[in-house]
């Protein structure tokens, strides 16, 4: 569940489009009728405070971020199958059938596009959510150690 001020900062459509036009976002995308974007100010504030940003982006967001000054390290957590995606969505019991179908189609597109050369630095296969999480944490810890050992 998305939470204001924790996962996202919600603004109305007019405000976000105005911010996008002004160049206040590193990346932005529209997904399932919502507009998502990464604020330059938020990322710069984190960097000034020696914090590392972990972002949850779609494929277009990753592409956009790769074309910035940030030098991001990108990880794709790949489902083992589209059936797995569908099963997880059904188990959540939060979407109607047509919405589940739409999300599965989007997942298929993402899985295909994730193979684009240079887009992701690491791909984790999510055959077991706990194992995938452990792999992600290990990658993050390694990257943090590497960052602080060189800076």
Curated annotation (Swiss-Prot):
Keywords associated with the record: Kinase, Transferase
Protein name: Guanylate kinase homolog
Pfam families per record: Guanylate_kin
SUPFAM superfamilies referenced in this protein's UniProt entry, alphabetically: P-loop containing nucleoside triphosphate hydrolases
Family according to the record: Belongs to the guanylate kinase family.
GO molecular function, one term: guanylate kinase activity
Domain of life of the source: Viruses
Domain Guanylate kinase-like: 1-141
Organism: Vaccinia virus (strain Western Reserve) (VACV)
């Amino acid at each position: 569940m998305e939470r204001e001020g924790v996962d996202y900062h919600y603004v109305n459509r007019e405000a976000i489009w105005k911010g996008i036009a002004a160049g206040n976002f590193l990346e932005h995308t529209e997904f399932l009728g919502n507009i998502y974007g990464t604020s330059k100010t938020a990322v710069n504030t984190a960097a000034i405070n020696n914090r590392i940003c972990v972002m949850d982006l779609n494929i277009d967001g990753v592409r956009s971020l790769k074309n910035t000054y940030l030098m991001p390290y990108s990880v794709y957590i790949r489902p083992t199958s589209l059936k797995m995606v569908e099963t997880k969505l059904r188990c959540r019991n939060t979407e109607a059938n047509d919405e589940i179908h739409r999300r599965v189609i989007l997942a298929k597109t993402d899985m295909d596009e994730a193979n684009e050369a240079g887009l992701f630095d690491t791909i984790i296969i999510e055959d077991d959510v706990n194992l995938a999480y452990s792999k992600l944490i290990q990658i993050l810890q390694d990257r943090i150690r590497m960052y602080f050992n060189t800076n």
